[in-house]
Amino acid sequence: MRMRTPLWSIPACALALSCASGPKPALKVDDSGLSRLDETQMQPVDDARIELGRAQDALSRARANEADAQARLTVAKTEREVADAQLKRALAERDLLKKQYAAQEQLTRADEEVRAAQDRIRAADMKRQYLERMVQVAQADRNAAAAHVDTGNALVEQSKLRAMRAADVPQAESANSGAIDSRVAESQVREAQLRKQAADLRAGAVDAYNKWQQVDVRVRTLARPEPMPVPPPNETQPPR
């Protein structure tokens, strides 16, 4: 029986490639005729441009979130190295006590320190796994945000053509409205697919976060303060 590959194990770049073939170059409308439109006739174009600006702002935020996720993962990898060093030190100290025929009370404390160090390693591993998934989520969110910008560009061109045609501007006659409408539809479909992929990845990250928290609660009293806060995988809302 063929095993299915979990979605979270697929790099975000591969997920993006699986979604159609990427954005096509935006179709441009000869908008020289827009100068003939009055304020009311230009309103749909202005509205589309405002939405495009919001999409571009959302893409900037998504890129910043991706950088934050990468930074948290880098810190987590360092914490794992520290936890490994602590375990090695605890094991060495316990071995030394055994060679010195130390008192049972000292050996018991050494055993407890070894177990605590092992718990810290398990917690560090689960934290790293969670943050690796959150990097994938951030990459998927960035891909979806970029697709939203592509959709916004297509809608701006569509609004220009419709506004000029409604005003009987000659420049509108040379444009292919069918191609522009098709470009909008393709952009919207691709954006929806990328948003679904991001949501699926986030669902996997929630499970990883919960597992990490269950282990981390046992070692939290021994752990040092977090050098960088690690938030839960809250769902991001699509830009409006």
Predicted regions, residues:
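Bacterial Sec signal peptide processing site at the extreme N-terminus
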Residues: 15-37
